[in-house]
Amino acid sequence: MAIEKKFVQEGFKKAMVDEYFLEKLERAGYGGMEINRTPMGTQITLKAEKPGMIIGKAGKSIRRYTKEMDMRFKMDNPQIDVQEVKKPELNAQMMATRLANALERGWYFRKAGQSTLQRIMDSGAMGCEVIIAGKLTGARKRREKFIAGYIKHCGKPVEELVDVGYARAKKKLGIIGVKVRIMPPEAVLPDQITIEAAQAAAPAPAEKKSPAAGAEPAKEAAAVPAPAESTAAEVEKIIAESEAAEAVTPEGAEGDEKAAAAKKQPKKKVVKTDGDSQS
């Protein structure tokens, strides 16, 4: 068998198993599956809103499904594990099934689509896309698309990050197809850049210096208290004294100068003659 044909058969078998569980476990809130091959056999992990309905009483239902995988799909030692979905609003298959049921109950397609989209975004999804196709209101088929947030449409991130779910709503006019694509909140895109805030550097510890020879006089000088500043009264007193010294008149200054000059001049001696004495 060619390798290409083997891959095609494996993909076809996986699609058939998924459709089988979707039909059998609709009431249990089926949310998809994963198939992994191990040395012990084939591990099948089912996601459901109500795991108890899949396991059944004393494990009766899950044993029946395991036997069906072995006989109908020829799987090697199948082992089924069931996981509970904590947030059904972030599971694309569950939301697609709920939307299809709402359309079958008579909800208007635009109201049902917007309501489903809002519930998914309120649960914290990064982005969501809801597509409803078929005979919605008239005789001709058409497609309505509802988009919110950010979602990838091509490339490898679509295969790894985007969750896709399909469902069908049976109405009188025909089948209406529903497709839901969800980008989970924890998805990390390859082109996403995160800038971290710079952390403040811790201050370096101060070095302990040995006391120098001239350090003690400096400490003593620093210990001497600085002279207190003059109070306002002392300042006013000094200003008044300086103004009084400047108020001396120039005449008084000249008299003082003449008195000082007279003291410096030598005194004249008067000699009396005989003529003066006789007269």
From Swiss-Prot:
Location of the KH type-2 domain: 17-86
Region (Disordered): 206-279
SMART domains: KH
Signal peptide range: none
Swiss-Prot/TrEMBL keywords: Ribonucleoprotein, Ribosomal protein, RNA-binding, rRNA-binding
HAMAP family for this protein: Ribosomal_uS3_A
Cited PANTHER family: 30S/40S RIBOSOMAL PROTEIN S3 (PTHR11760), SMALL RIBOSOMAL SUBUNIT PROTEIN US3 (PTHR11760:SF32)
Function: Binds the lower part of the 30S subunit head.
Stated name of the protein: Small ribosomal subunit protein uS3
Organism annotation: Methanocella arvoryzae (strain DSM 22066 / NBRC 105507 / MRE50)
Lineage: Archaea, Methanobacteriati, Methanobacteriota, Stenosarchaea group, Methanomicrobia
